[in-house]
């Protein structure tokens, strides 16, 4: 893969007969974490005509690499939408008010704080969507953990594909780090396209040098 410079790796996934959910193997996780090319994990499910494709973004990130990855996620998702005659939607999760802050600071107003965070995420996501001529109706900005929000929105929309960014060993773009990345993907019951940021160098490539 690294030596030949392929543009895409497609890997089949297995469905657990009892749980009726997709089971990702250690090989799947290895590819997601270390493969420099986009990885498409597919299940045995046909894509419907005029379906939905969901792009998972973090519109409030201030990291330039993450912001660039957001745009790549949307561009690649839109390209697939054009091929599949599907509708593109964005999903952005924002955190709930930390309980410990409300307890430790008596004058803290959790309601006001939560509204401020929500407003920031809505405005940032809508602005990102506008760059790609997407309407606000195509944006889903919801409170909660990414591993809860993204699969929930994907299920409600009956999305055939979720496009998501990964940044190697640190997990998914921006807020999606560590085990959170695996929880998100593990909770999705649809195809997943995992993208790396531009300039990503696989640790496997370093070993080959």
Describe the residue ranges of each PLM region.
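Short beta-strand elements of ligand-binding domains
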Residues: 10-13, 38-44, 193-196
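General small-molecule cofactor/ligand-binding pocket signal
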Residues: 40, 89-91, 137-142, 193
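Short, structured interface segments
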Residues: 28-47
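Glycine-rich, Arg-bearing micro-motifs that act as flexible, cationic patches
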Residues: 11-30, 161-187
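Small/aliphatic-rich secondary-structure junction motif
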Residues: 52-108, 131, 187-188, 192, ...
């Amino acid at each position: 893969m690294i030596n030949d410079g392929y543009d895409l790796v497609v890997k089949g996934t297995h469905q657990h007969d009892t749980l009726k959910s997709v089971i990702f193997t250690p090989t799947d996780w290895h590819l997601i974490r270390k493969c420099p090319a986009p990885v498409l994990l597919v299940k045995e499910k046909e894509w419907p005509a005029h379906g939905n494709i969901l792009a998972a973004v973090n519109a409030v990130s201030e990291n330039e690499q993450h912001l660039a990855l957001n745009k790549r996620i949307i561009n690649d998702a839109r390209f697939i939408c054009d091929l599949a005659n599907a509708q593109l939607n964005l999903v952005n999760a924002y955190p709930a008010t930390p309980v410990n802050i409300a307890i430790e600071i008596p004058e803290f107003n959790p309601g006001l704080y939560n509204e401020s965070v929500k407003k920031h995420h809505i405005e940032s996501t809508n602005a990102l969507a506008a760059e790609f001529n997407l309407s606000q109706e195509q944006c889903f900005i919801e409170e909660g953990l990414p591993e809860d929000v993204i699969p929930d929105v994907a299920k409600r929309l009956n999305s055939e594909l979720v496009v998501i960014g990964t940044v190697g060993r640190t997990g998914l773009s921006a807020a999606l780090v560590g085990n959170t990345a695996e929880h998100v993907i593990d909770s999705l019951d649809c195809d997943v396209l995992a993208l790396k940021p531009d300039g990503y160098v696989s640790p496997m490539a370093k070993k080959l040098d």
